């Protein structure tokens, strides 16, 4: 079984925003880790229990009215925009799926939708 979820990627602020449904689909882990498969244009997000050099903390207020989760990584955003030939002046929303069996969120970067 899988559920549809989204992330958005912004070149200008170097941020990857995880929608609340994405964090909820991963069972609100304390930390998440991002993986990119360059040749298949896939981005994966996995839950993690421990803080490491490669994990990102889930905010405690994620489900508050003003709560949000943004992973700031200008280098990753620049690399994604370059690889996907995206317009740097646009924000991209990428639909994905939660694979419950492996508790992994997968995002097909080829299905990104340009906004603004």
Regions found by a protein language model. Give the residues of each.
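Acidic (E/D-rich), amphipathic helical modules within compact regulatory domains
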Residues: 23-41
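Mature exported/compartmentalized surface modules and terminal targeting/interaction regions
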Residues: 38-39, 44-116
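Short beta-strand-centered segments at strand-helix junctions
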Residues: 15-27, 72-73, 77-78
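Beta-strand-rich binding-surface signature
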Residues: 15, 31, 104
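Glycine-rich loop/turn
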Residues: 1-13
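Residues that act as N-cap/strand-start positions at coil-to-secondary-structure junctions
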Residues: 1-3, 28, 90-92
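Short, surface-exposed charged micro-motifs
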Residues: 6-8, 31-35, 95-97
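Short, conserved beta-strand segments within well-ordered enzyme catalytic domains
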Residues: 17, 35, 44
């Amino acid at each position: 079984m899988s559920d549809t979820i989204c992330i958005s990627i912004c070149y200008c602020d170097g941020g990857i925003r995880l929608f609340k449904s994405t964090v909820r689909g991963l069972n609100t882990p304390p930390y998440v880790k991002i993986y990119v498969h360059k040749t298949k244009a896939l981005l994966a997000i996995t839950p993690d229990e421990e803080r490491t050099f490669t994990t990102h903390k889930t905010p405690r207020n994620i489900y508050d009215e003003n709560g949000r989760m943004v992973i700031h990584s200008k280098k990753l955003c620049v690399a994604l925009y370059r690889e996907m030939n995206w317009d740097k002046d646009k924000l991209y929303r990428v639909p994905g799926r939660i694979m419950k069996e492996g508790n992994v969120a997968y995002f097909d970067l080829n299905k990104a939708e340009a906004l603004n």
